[in-house]
Amino acid sequence: MPTQQTVTAPSLENRLITLQHNSSVLANNPLGDPSQRPVNVYLPKAYYDRRRKNRRFAVLYSLAGFTGAGPGQLNWKGFEENLVERLERLITSKQMAPTIVVFPDCFTAFGGT
């Protein structure tokens, strides 16, 4: 008889926050696309290290492909890492420097970004 195993998602050691951006460019646009957009931002654990207040970080803007949206890049994946999990692994294993990653929602009524 097979044994039952408990599977838990990896813990998110770093931070993922959501900001709201009000775009004056999209205000009153003819397609009726919302001008207020969520912007997810990944902040590495080192960002909160108070001993290094003046530290600077590289910033990457992760733009989703056509018909994709920023929030979709954060989705759970059953058999592989999502983007945040990959960032966690690469930063923790020192294969990547601590980096801020911005995931803007650029989806439009045309279905693209």
Language-model segments: residues:
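Non-catalytic cap/lid and distal C-terminal segments of serine-dependent acyl enzymes
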Residues: 1-113
